[in-house]
Amino acid sequence: MKDTTKKIPTKKKNSINVVKHNSLINIKSDEAFTVSQKKLVCHLIANIKPKEVDFPIKEVALKDLGFIDDNMQNYTWFRKEFLQLLKMPFIIPNDGGWANWFSYLKYEKGIIKYSFDPRLKPFLLELKGNFTMYNLDNVLNLKTNYAITLFELLMKNIGIGKLKMEIEEFMKIMNLPNYPNGELKRYLTRIQKEIIENTIINFSFEFVKQGAKAKYILFKIKNKASKKDLQSNVEETKNLLKNGKQQEMFNEEIVVAAIETKIEDNNQSLRDKFKNLRMINDRQ
């Protein structure tokens, strides 16, 4: 019998990746960024070219951002939402300095003109290591700013497979209110569902006590990609390396995920391959 089930077209996947130094994953600010602000920042970071050494003024069409709805087409709303980023400095961990995401932002006739803050050059340009990388679609699919922040924290640690943080520190990075643990658990359960349904990550979490009181949150993290997909991505990465494109295309996310599933090729473990790729990348 002929299958008459209607095929649902799959959404075209973005081919661009967000790459940022791990210090930018743990930023703290006095005011929480909105989900639209976070998506804008991620999208514009993904537009940085691998060989760029400076932050020129660039432009992007509002309609090309991939997360704009009818409400966002309103100029007044857009100006209030995005230009507010110029007034939202954050502290860079392990640096101690305050920075804004942008030194220049302008919106005119559906076009955003922007330039990143030059103080962010060491954290966004010519990265050799200690960075997190993921496909842009992961954050574009999320619906809350808290889900985006937690997704990045988990991606940073996906190669290790776990993340343990003090609850107090976690709340500061997430910019969450001072929830009691019971309410925090319920809230995290909602965020967990959102992340698992919309990104490449699967994870669980639990509170860890010190004495009689819970002091830490422990996340256990897995990549949802199939073994077959990971092997295919590893082969693609190897071909790119063969063609001399290691600086442009070195995909830490793919290799770490492959290590996690213990895929091996030509009797050499991917852990060793990853180490070799690091050495190649550091020489660029």
Where do the model's predicted regions map?
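Charged, alpha-helix-forming regions
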Residues: 1-283
